[in-house]
């Protein structure tokens, strides 16, 4: 590390998650895309984002349950920074997307027995 002579730097590795990617052709992703297109009037743009939401990896590894993460923030929201904000209309649009998503999932995904996968 480029530090002043009086500064010592040490790095200790902590815990980490295994990476997870849900296929864009998964029924849950397609249902989320349809809900977003209906609410926002345009097809969503897919991105891969890094993050550390530990349950996502566990849902995938332990339960075999794919996870769809959907964001409603805007680039200028300064998420996790000073003066963080979240536009109220984006919040309302997110609610509309999620209600349509739940309807879409209910009609798209296969029903499973209460005791099985």
What do the predicted segments below correspond to?
Residues 2-117:
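An extended, acidic, His-containing surface patch that forms the Zn2+-binding/catalytic region
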